[in-house]
Amino acid sequence: MKKYDRKIVLDIETTGMNPAGCFYKNHKIIEIGAVEMINNVFTGNNFHSYIQPNRLIDKQSFKIHGITDNFLLDKPKFHEISVKFLEYITNSDLIIHNAKFDVGFINYELNMINSDKRKISDYCNVVDTLPLARQLFPGKKNSLDALCNRYKINVSHRDFHSALIDAKLLAKVYTFMTSFQQSISIFDKNSNLNSIQKNAKLDSRVPFRSTLLLATKDELQQHMKYLKYVKQETGNCVWLEDKYN
């Protein structure tokens, strides 16, 4: 599979989902939010659209995203934004958390407007961050909220779920996960110090990814906070000793 430097981080909101059977059948997408990163740098080239679903929103879903039926009355339908959306994601690595959900809905919408039955994977690579999170944090909660809390990413501005806001949060989470895959377990205060140092030695034999060099100032400050936290909890932090003293 070809990998692209261009990463599109995506999230959607929907009218709801079915608790049994096909989870997306007869439900619709009501918001798509996506942000573009190149070499882990936000470009500002975002995609965002609310969508008129031509059906009512389930009460439980409204409690999650706060989007009302009346708000969507004058919004475009999916087929009206589909061409622009597909052009936007073409030739990219499409980063999604729990991709089965989003991809299922998007393919369902595409199948209703396209006779050729093309899928989203025909336009881009789909990368699911949930399996990666489970690999890094086995046995722990790995929802987007849990990951933001684990990485100390500020979500105070987020009263409801929003596709665009959640896409931006996931982009930050993805940057952390892919930049520090070997050493990320140090952020768990219950990690064994010997394991931490072993991981550090393993990391020292692997060149840093270029994306790490392009981390933003805020991301570097957040990483430094983690390192200081490790030292406070364990009494030692090999990263601070070797690289920052």
Swiss-Prot record:
Q: Write out the residues that bind a divalent metal cation 2.
A: D11
Q: Which SUPFAM superfamilies match?
A: Ribonuclease H-like (SSF53098)
Under Enzyme Commission nomenclature, its number is 2.7.7.7
Key word Magnesium present: yes
Q: What class of enzyme is it?
A: transferase
Offer one example of a GO biological process linked to this entry: DNA replication proofreading
Q: Which reaction does it catalyse?
A: DNA(n) + a 2'-deoxyribonucleoside 5'-triphosphate = DNA(n+1) + diphosphate
Keywords on record: DNA replication, DNA-directed DNA polymerase, Exonuclease, Hydrolase, Magnesium, Manganese, Metal-binding, Nuclease, Nucleotidyltransferase, Transferase
> Which cofactor is recorded for it?
Mg(2+); Mn(2+)
Q: How is the cofactor bound?
A: Binds 2 divalent metal cations. Magnesium or manganese.
A single Gene Ontology MF term assigned here is: metal ion binding
Q: Quote any Pfam family the record assigns.
A: RNase_T
Does the keyword Nucleotidyltransferase feature in the UniProt annotation? yes
What are the catalytic residues? H161
Q: Which residues bind substrate?
A: D11, E13, Q60, H65, D166
Q: How does it assemble?
A: The DNA polymerase holoenzyme is a complex that contains 10 different types of subunits. These subunits are organized into 3 functionally essential subassemblies: the pol III core, the beta sliding clamp processivity factor and the clamp-loading complex. The pol III core (subunits alpha,epsilon and theta) contains the polymerase and the 3'-5' exonuclease proofreading activities. The polymerase is tethered to the template via the sliding clamp processivity factor.
Q: What is this protein called?
A: DNA polymerase III subunit epsilon
Q: Which organism is it from?
A: Buchnera aphidicola subsp. Baizongia pistaciae (strain Bp)
For this protein's source organism, the top of the classification is:
Bacteria, Pseudomonadati, Pseudomonadota, Gammaproteobacteria, Enterobacterales
